[in-house]
Amino acid sequence: MINYLFTITTWLIIISYWFIIIIVTCRILSKRRAISSSAAWLLVIYIIPFIGICTWFLLEEPYLGTRKLKLIKSVWSKKNKHFNNLKSHNYIFENNNSEVARSLFKLCKYRQGISGIKFNKLKLLKNTKDVIKNLVRDIYLAKNTIEIVFYIWKPGGLADNVAIALIQSAKRGIKCRLMLDSAGSLEFFRSKWVDMMQQSGIQIVEALKINLLHFFFRRMDLRQHRKFILIDNYITYIGSMNLVDPYLFKKSLGIGQWIDLMTRIEGPISTTMGAIYSCDWEVETGQQISPKRVKNNLIIPTYPIKECTSIVQVIASGPGFTEDMIHQALLTAIYSAQQKLTMTTPYLVPSDDLLRAICTAAQRGVEVILIIPKSHDSLLVKWASRVFFSELLESGVKIYQFKKGLLHSKSVLVDKQLSLIGTVNLDMRSLWLNFEITLVIDDKNFGKSLAIIHNEYISHSSLLDPKLWKIRSYWKKIIEKLFYFLSPLL
């Protein structure tokens, strides 16, 4: 009898095991994902079934939640009213783009429903101290609203200057809203600043809040990765910088300070940023804070028109927003390059399509430069990035490894004319998962400024020698091959 029960139990376990394997396999194959990503998941599931299946359900199957995804789509679609209102001020729109930017701006127009916007004054800020100094000044000068979203806010050092300025502005009647990612800003939410800010009247939202219940129903690595500040619906700061002191942040890793890049904008493009912020805020709180109807005095610039040479688009990406938009934008920008393409990213784990586009650009005579950090804060990303070096080098891509800290800026410059700056890394997480934001800028003067910064990065970098790369140690090649299978999962 015991043997019979044992046999039945064994067969039930075996049948259940293969049933689950088959179900998960069918689910993986039914999703519209890159072949490399599907193959990587299947490999993990068949080699280490229990761990592989559990990891799949935790990282892939629970996405954002059907209910919340529908909410985002619904709220974002309502913002079309704001864009329609903006269209009544037709003199701020510009459809006559430069040749290299034309395809990308057409893509943005037809997929997002709005043309490029002119009359914007842009300034690149490459030093965190300068960013904080300018930001604190603008916060003190705010007249109506201050709206902030960051992935990481780490108290201490320069970050506290912003906190103090916010509190003082709130006390004088400025409406202040602060939205921070729950995981990235965990230290902030455990600090004294939360109570101090709330007591002064600042509204604080913990975005994509982490708790035990969500662990089973939503991806924990899906994060609010946007980083921008909107003041009076007219001034915007946007870029790669988290609200941290670069001299203190992750100091124990011994990789030096973080090097970021931000853009300060004055002009009507900020009204688009306001629509994006109000969407994120409403999704998290249920509170509608849609930007007020745009008036002429908010559109007409207060600075000389001759300074407004930039045509700007904004791409908001993430679950519920325009599907695959940032991936398509990057591909379009790369394929538009005719002379020179420079890209900076801290994390290089591109999709197959992006890798092919970058290599093809180099093979058709475009000078392609990739600037990445030599030291990483993530061992996984470090090895995963190296997987792609051989193919890039063989195609003629120049890879520079930045040595003076962790280069965290995310930028693309095409033919010194078309620029992309924002929060998107060249990795799967930024391209397909996180909530991100990117500026698209058609402006030769801005391109020149960005090129100068890129050259400064290069001056503090070492050029990877293709010959030396080929003769690297055998054990390194083995580790890289192992990470090749895991790279689509990162």
From Swiss-Prot:
Signal peptide: none annotated. It catalyses: 2 a 1,2-diacyl-sn-glycero-3-phospho-(1'-sn-glycerol) = a cardiolipin + glycerol. Its EC number is 2.7.8.-. It is a multi-pass membrane protein. It comes from the Bacteria. The active site is at H225, K227, D232, H408, K410, D415. InterPro entries: Cardiolipin_synthase, CL_synthase_A, CLS_N, PLD-like_dom, PLipase_D/transphosphatidylase. Residues 220-247, 403-430 form the PLD phosphodiesterase domain. One of its GO terms (cellular component) is plasma membrane. It is found in: Cell membrane. One of its GO terms (biological process) is cardiolipin biosynthetic process. The keyword Transmembrane helix applies. SMART domains: PLDc (SM00155). GO terms for molecular function: cardiolipin synthase activity. Keywords: Cell membrane, Lipid biosynthesis, Lipid metabolism, Membrane, Phospholipid biosynthesis, Phospholipid metabolism, Repeat, Transferase, Transmembrane, Transmembrane helix. The chain crosses the membrane at residues 4-24, 39-59. It is an enzyme of class 2 (transferase). Belongs to the phospholipase D family. Cardiolipin synthase subfamily. ClsA sub-subfamily. PANTHER family: CARDIOLIPIN SYNTHASE (PTHR21248), PHOSPHOLIPASE D (PTHR21248:SF22). Catalyzes the reversible phosphatidyl group transfer from one phosphatidylglycerol molecule to another to form cardiolipin (CL) (diphosphatidylglycerol) and glycerol. This is Cardiolipin synthase A. It comes from Buchnera aphidicola subsp. Baizongia pistaciae (strain Bp). The lineage of its organism: Bacteria, Pseudomonadati, Pseudomonadota, Gammaproteobacteria, Enterobacterales. The gene is clsA.
